[in-house]
């Protein structure tokens, strides 16, 4: 009978296969960079970035992320318009809206355009990470990861 060396229960290539893939859509280069660094530090994979709603929708169709972080105020197509398109074409992908204008959008409108959560940018990125974890945990994350 052949002898097998004991190996890790999870091969090295798949140890982090649980990492949820996130698309960041924000017109601010620095904002995208900071959000991306923060999410990756928290254990998520940033699979792509876009600078406006039109580009973001194209990236979402191409990349099929697990979650989308979307800024409200952007050129060409704002976050509410992009969220509406995304919720229609990709309803299984949760959208988290980041904004400095939370009281302008309103919870009812956010729900109507398919946004799962609104995070005020002034609340800090810890709140964003907690929100992303709560939206992804049931489907994509093992209990001991969060």
Name each model feature, range by range.
Residues 61-63, 85-92, 113:
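Conserved phosphotransfer cores of two-component systems
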Residues 29-48:
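Two-component/phosphorelay signaling modules centered on CheY-like receiver
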Residues 1-21, 126-146:
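Non-catalytic signal-transmission and effector/linker regions of two-component phosphorelay proteins
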Residues 63-69:
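Active-site beta3 strand of CheY-like receiver
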């Amino acid at each position: 009978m052949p002898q097998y060396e004991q190996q890790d229960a999870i091969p090295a290539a798949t140890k982090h296969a649980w990492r949820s893939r996130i698309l960041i859509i924000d017109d601010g280069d620095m904002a995208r960079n900071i959000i991306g660094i923060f999410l990756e530090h928290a254990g998520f994979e940033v699979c792509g970035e876009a600078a406006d709603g039109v580009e973001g929708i194209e990236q979402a169709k191409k990349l099929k992320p697990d979650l989308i972080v979307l800024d409200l105020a952007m050129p060409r197509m704002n976050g509410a318009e992009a969220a509406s398109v995304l919720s229609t074409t990709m309803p299984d992908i949760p959208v988290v809206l980041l904004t400095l204008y939370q009281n302008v959008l309103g919870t009812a409108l956010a729900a109507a355009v398919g946004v799962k959560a609104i995070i005020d940018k002034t609340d800090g990125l810890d709140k964003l990470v907690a929100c992303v974890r709560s939206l992804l945990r049931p489907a994509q994350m093992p209990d001991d990861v969060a």
